[in-house]
Amino acid sequence: MFELNDDFVIQKEEFSKSFIYIIDNFYKNPEQVHDYLFENEAPLHKIEEVPTSNNVYFEDRRLFKDDERLIPVINFLSELVSQKPLTYELLTNQTKFYIDDFNDYKNCYWWPHHDAGYNGIVYFNNDNQNGTNIYYEIKSKKMLTEHYQPWRSKNDFKVLKHLEPKFNRLVFFDGYKFLHGMNIVNDRYFSDEYRKNQVFFFKDLLDDFT
C-alpha cells in the first residue's frame, strides 16, 4: 500500500540555517493510497472544544489510525532528518470552508503555528497554489485556540517561503524552527472539495516542546 517510488529524487534546499526536502512522485501507487486515506470523511478535529468555529464556518477533519504498513515510510523520514517520530499513527487532514466573511483569506493567513520538529506533508489534490507557507511574525499577539479564531491578519506576518503543492509531492521542513501554516489563496475549497493531505510529525530531541 505505502510503497515508495524506487527512483524518486530527493531535493534538498538549504534555507535559514536549516534544510527543506521535496520529493515528487513519493508513493509508487498514489491513487491507491489516496483512495485508502480519503474513502470516508474523517472525524471533525477537536470538535469538543468550546468555543469552536469548526463545523460552523469550516470543516477541519483529521484521521488518526494505526497502520503497521506505514512504519517503513516513517522510519525512512526519521533517518533523513535524524529526528524521532512523534507518533507512528497514520494522520490525514481534510479541510474545506463555508462561504462566509469569517473566511477572509484575502486579508488573513490560516493559523500560523509551530510544531514539535520536522513536518512531512504529502499533498493529494491536483493543485499548485494552496500549499504551505513559512512565516516571520512581525507583530506578536495573543494566540487563541486554533478552531475558534484561526485566521490571522496578514499585517502581522511576512511570508518567507511558499512550499508549492503537487499531487503525490512530499514537502519536509522543520516545523519547530519555522512558523508555518496552510496557504489559502483562492476559493477552490469553498465547495464540496476538501484540501487533502497526509502528515508526519517528528520531534527535535534537542528542544523541550510541550
What does each of the following model-derived ranges do?
Residues 100-210:
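Catalytic core of non-heme Fe(II) oxygenases with the double-stranded beta-helix
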